[in-house]
Amino acid sequence: MAQTLYDKLWNTHVVHTEEDGTTLLYIDRQLLHEVTSPQAFEGLKIAQRPVWRISANLAVSDHNVPTTDRSHGIADPVSKLQVDTLDSNCDAFGITQFKMNDVRQGIVHIIGPEQGATLPGMTIVCGDSHTSTHGAFGALAHGIGTSEVEHVLATQTLLQKKSKNMLVKVEGALPRGCTAKDIVLAIIGKIGTAGGTGYAIEFGGSTIRALTMEGRMTVCNMAIEAGARAGMVAVDDTTIDYLKGRPFVPTGAEWDQAVEYWRQFKSDDGAQFDRVVELNAAEIVPQVTWGTSPEMVTSIDGRVPDPEREKDPVKRDAMERALAYMALEPNTPIESIKVDKIFIGSCTNARIEDIRAAAYVVKKLNRRVASNVRLAMVVPGSGLVKAQAEREGLDKVFTDAGFEWREPGCSMCLAMNADRLEPGERCASTSNRNFEGRQGAGGRTHLVSPAMAAAAAIEGHFVDIRQLG
């Protein structure tokens, strides 16, 4: 019987299934960070349980670490306590960790793939919503709660119920100026933030196959924003080429065996999906969110929608509330919206490809950050991304134009560290969530691609990067 990619990943990890469908799944890799792991480790200590499989875990501090000078440590006492607690827990249990001043430190969903800890055919969990990122490698990856983090530490298993299968198929050549971020925002705009609820989404089609691994990770990262349990892409040569030679990846004869095994993780011809959604890549244009949900998105050449035209009263109320929070009027041209801050970073868009794309726009425009922009910051996703960008001279491109070049971390994606918006500030952000207060109480977030964010920094408002040439 033909199987989908999700079917194969699920079936190869079933330990036991109850009559009601509840399944005990084996977990190959758990990624840990400082926010959702303290209670899990404390539970182990209280119960006097060991970590079942130490080598299956990898830890890093990312949410609370400063992105400015780290020589003075962490100023906020709560943030410092969380980071110190992860350090001590990993030391006590023997878990591999990249500490704050390790060059390998970075955002958990960036360091996993770049180290080769994320591999095809794996089940991967982390106490973080955007664990779906790792599905780009033909893996089943999703976020879990703190009690589940403890359960995986203790047993290397997890109780789950199988999701339905969805295929999102994107065909055709992506137009100039459009990126993986625009693809996934367009998908969410089409199906909504509840469109994937109850499903695991496989992203396929010629457009997805043409993406780099960085681009595929961006798409899978935001599967959760479409309501899906997980997002994934089939294994191909692009996957294999990315992984070869990375630190955690098998070598020699074991590499050859692994590659042969990994290549099975794709949907069989004739595999049946419960839902299929199709997009034409030629119709995708640079995207900008206007509201307080990723589904509140439109094209750069569009306008802020008018709630009066929405027939659904629930959606109309949500639109009205969003516009009030965002301080926007219906029918406002997107290109006329001015911004106060720029954030280029996050687990969605802080890889070397993203940094290069933003730097290209800055060089192309050849001007400094606009006078109305109070802060434009670039936060690499890891120490290794930062080092690579500096070798290429990209840091100087940004700093010469008036951007701040920071240390790696989650930064302004969420208001959990020193990088945040003040009430009323408007930000062009390459992150994944534009909820009320996400980047700081009263802050207003517009989600865009790195190239779009860079252009907004220079112009002081949103612009259509397709016109840059």
From Swiss-Prot:
[4Fe-4S] cluster binds at residues 347, 410, 413. The keyword Magnesium does not apply. Keywords: 4Fe-4S, Amino-acid biosynthesis, Branched-chain amino acid biosynthesis, Iron, Iron-sulfur, Leucine biosynthesis, Lyase, Metal-binding. Pathway: Amino-acid biosynthesis; L-leucine biosynthesis; L-leucine from 3-methyl-2-oxobutanoate: step 2/4. SUPFAM superfamilies: Aconitase iron-sulfur domain (SSF53732). Gene3D superfamilies: Aconitase, domain 3. The keyword Iron-sulfur applies. It comes from the Bacteria. It is an enzyme of class 4 (lyase). GO terms for biological process: L-leucine biosynthetic process. One of its GO terms (molecular function) is metal ion binding. It catalyses: (2R,3S)-3-isopropylmalate = (2S)-2-isopropylmalate. Binds 1 [4Fe-4S] cluster per subunit. Pfam families: Aconitase. Its EC number is 4.2.1.33. Its cofactor is [4Fe-4S] cluster. Heterodimer of LeuC and LeuD. Belongs to the aconitase/IPM isomerase family. LeuC type 1 subfamily. NCBIfam families: leuC, PRK05478.1, PRK12466.1. Catalyzes the isomerization between 2-isopropylmalate and 3-isopropylmalate, via the formation of 2-isopropylmaleate. This is 3-isopropylmalate dehydratase large subunit. It comes from Burkholderia cenocepacia (strain HI2424). The lineage of its organism: Bacteria, Pseudomonadati, Pseudomonadota, Betaproteobacteria, Burkholderiales. The gene is leuC.
